[in-house]
Design a protein with these regions (language model features):
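Active-site C-terminal subdomain of aminotransferase-like
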Residues: 15-16, 192-278, 282
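Conserved beta-loop-alpha segment that forms the PLP phosphate-binding cup at the N-terminus of a helix
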Residues: 54-83, 87, 91-95
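Conserved PLP-binding catalytic core of the aspartate aminotransferase-like
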Residues: 286-320
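Active-site phosphate-binding strand-loop segment of PLP-dependent enzymes
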Residues: 116-173
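PLP-dependent enzyme catalytic core of the Aspartate aminotransferase-like
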Residues: 331, 335-369
Length: 369
């Protein structure tokens, strides 16, 4: 669903459906009163359905990165050994958070565009039997690759008691991730991607094993102390002032997702993603994902040919066609562009992108379009 002005095709923030926009105009209420308690209880219960979990789920007023930081500081102590898997910009971010708080990080790095093999993690666990946690980015937004989280969870559980901490910021709600079914201990995500609301809320699940680790965790924490969040939730409150407007929007967005049915959401996302990849290849582009079976259902990353000026292409798509694409991050800056297809997206949104590219690319001297 594109906005009236732009077809926003970044992998977050994503376009806001009309019911969400309307919910954002709801009047303020007392965040310590019964009305907010009802809102918090309802959204938390619905969020558990999307997470596919019976574990605790908390809604934080923060970005998705806040949830990632929370996952580290609530389960680990300085000096704890952690296996961290990265094949992109956001995997690197998770690594840096763990390092910042003093974890001893054993890094598994893969080429950007490659999937992370569960066998690499299995071998690392065997080499480091005292590892306390494995951290992994499920869907790497910077490369358009979805890693084999199910296989990784199996590899971890069959070889250790390590906690499994998951960055699911650009996957949960769009790509299947049964938190309990796969045995994930802590899963973090954010509001501005699959959940179709503005940035500003973060969501995190916390298992019983994670709570056992919490009792021993010695990393400093205050705002992101999930013990405080749990005590407050039992009273129908949050420990700190919440973004009430985003809670209103979230309540509506969750209703939309659950009414469609999560399985139907996954099917729609997969279909749109397949159409996007097919269309990009038909235009003569090469996907960054080296294994298309692991290509993301929420964002497609595409190599930019040498003959194409990436900044001019992005500018023309926005200024002339009113379509906003995402560029590359870090070492991929200027080398790829990314098409976001998550949230309320339908195939017609991507058809607009493809038609616009067919008009813009020849003007820029790209002959394959």
């Amino acid at each position: 669903m594109a906005s009236d002005t732009f077809n926003l095709r970044t992998p977050g923030p994503t376009p806001l459906p009309d019911p969400v926009l309307e919910a954002l105009t709801s009047p303020m209420i007392n965040h310590r009163g019964p009305e907010f308690k009802t809102l918090l209880d309802d959204t938390t219960a619905k969020m558990k359905q999307v997470f596919m979990t019976q574990q605790d789920v908390f809604i934080l007023t923060a970005s998705g990165t806040g949830a990632l930081e929370s996952s580290i500081v609530n389960t680990l102590s300085p000096g704890d050994k952690v296996i961290a898997c990265s094949a992109g910009s956001f995997g690197d971010r998770y690594v840096e958070i763990a390092k910042t708080y003093g974890a001893e990080v054993i890094e598994i790095r893969c080429e950007w565009g490659d999937p992370i093999s569960p066998s690499l993690i299995e071998q690392s666990i065997k080499d480091n039997p005292d590892v306390k946690a494995v951290i992994i980015t499920h869907n790497e937004t910077s490369t358009g690759v979805t890693h084999d989280l199910e296989g990784i969870c199996k590899a971890v559980k069959s070889n250790s008691d390590a906690l499994i901490l998951v960055d699911a910021v650009s996957s949960l709600g769009s790509i299947p991730l049964p938190v309990d079914g796969w045995g994930c201990d802590v899963v973090s995500t954010g509001s501005q991607k699959s959940f179709m609301i503005p940035p500003g809320l973060a969501f995190i699940s916390f298992s019983e094993r994670a709570w056992a680790a919490y009792e021993k965790a010695q990393m400093p924490k205050s705002y992101f102390d999930l013990g405080a969040a749990k005590k407050s939730l039992e009273q129908g409150q949050t420990p700190w002032t919440p973004n009430i407007s985003l809670f209103y929007a979230l309540d509506v967005a969750l209703d939309m997702m659950l009414e469609e049915g999560m399985e139907n959401v996954f099917i729609r996302q997969s279909s749109v993603a397949e159409y996007t990849r097919k269309s990009m290849k038909e235009l003569g582009f090469k996907l960054l994902a080296t294994d298309e079976n692991r290509a993301s259902d929420t964002v497609t990353a595409v190599h930019i040919p040498e003959e194409l000026d990436s900044s001019r292409f992005m500018r023309e798509m926005k200024d002339t066609e009113k379509i906003v694409l995402a560029g590359g991050q870090g070492k991929l800056s200027g080398k790829i562009f990314r098409v976001g297809h998550l949230g309320s997206v339908v195939q017609e949104d991507i058809e607009e992108v493809v038609d616009a590219m067919k008009r813009v690319l020849p003007e820029l001297g790209y002959s394959n379009a």
